[in-house]
Amino acid sequence: MPKQTVALFFGGKSVEHIISIISARAVASHIDHSRYDITPLYIDRGGHWHGGACAKRILALDVAVLLRNGGQDEVFERLDEITSFDEGKRFDLTAFFDSIDVAFLTLHGSYGEDGKIQGCLDTFDIPYAGCGLTSSALSMDKALTKLCAADAGVEVAGFMSVTSADYAADPQAICNAVTERFAFPVFVKPANLGSSVGISKVHNAAELRPALDKACALDAKVLVEETITGREVEVAVLGNDDPIASVPGEIIPGSDFYDFEDKYVKSDAKLVIPADLPGEVSAAVRNAALTVFKALGCSGMARVDFFVEHGTNRIILNEINTIPGFTDISMYPMLMSASGVEFDELISRLLLLALEKRAINPKI
């Protein structure tokens, strides 16, 4: 059987740009090269597409080391230096799509995980690993995710959503509404970002406005959410119509909560796989993950995050990620590995699921 060509999309316009590159490097190292050839496609922070030698040079760049040693500024300086050689060149989108068989996306966050790139690929009839346009868009919006999950019978934390426009018009009114509805501490988070970017834990009224300022600067919609005192547990889901759920894994944060630094830079968080949960709680978490996955119409992959409340073992949805991290310290591949699906096999299965979905739904 001839090799198939996989377009590996990475980079993107979101604040998770660097993490996307790290994920892409891991995927490239674990793909079955006897079955697939990789054609990298790098999207810079301005949304410009770069293929060929430019994308290959960036994929070869060990940005994780640069990030640890020099911070984000040094990473972006190197990326800009490489892409400068592509200035003035016109990317031939049609020729690129004509040359590939299937796409694998490691575009985390906005403009990658929210349905935009999925719609583009659908237009060009390119199969891709992971969720489609609608499920991606729903899952990206934390408020809509909670509404869909609650409708399917999965418990969610109490929350209120605030538009950045309403907050800008009357910040004090929004702050008053929050303090009337919730007891502190609360979490303030952008509705459409991942990797814990822009999230603040607010302990009192004095901290509320700075947290809202921070989140509203990053997103047009913001969530204020009650704090759940419990264990942070995650489940990886893999499949299309008959998905499987991994063993649950627990995150013990190295800071006040599992933030961007814990996930990708200093790695102080402790990951426990499988999570030390009673058997019935573990089974219930896995079932809840499958329920959320199906309620949102997901396909291919997702990581579903929960809280297991101290004392009661109530299972409460936190969020879902339809393009979870694929770095060497990311939960999704580690959870699947602990469930018998190693990283190399995981990539192959995701690509096969993409082709399977297109075969069943040729017009989608």
Swiss-Prot record:
Mg(2+) 1 binds at residues 305, 319. Its cofactor is Mg(2+); Mn(2+). Residues 146-352 form the ATP-grasp domain. The gene is ddl. This is D-alanine--D-alanine ligase. GO terms for molecular function: ATP binding; D-alanine-D-alanine ligase activity; metal ion binding. ATP binds at residues 179-234. It is an enzyme of class 6 (ligase).
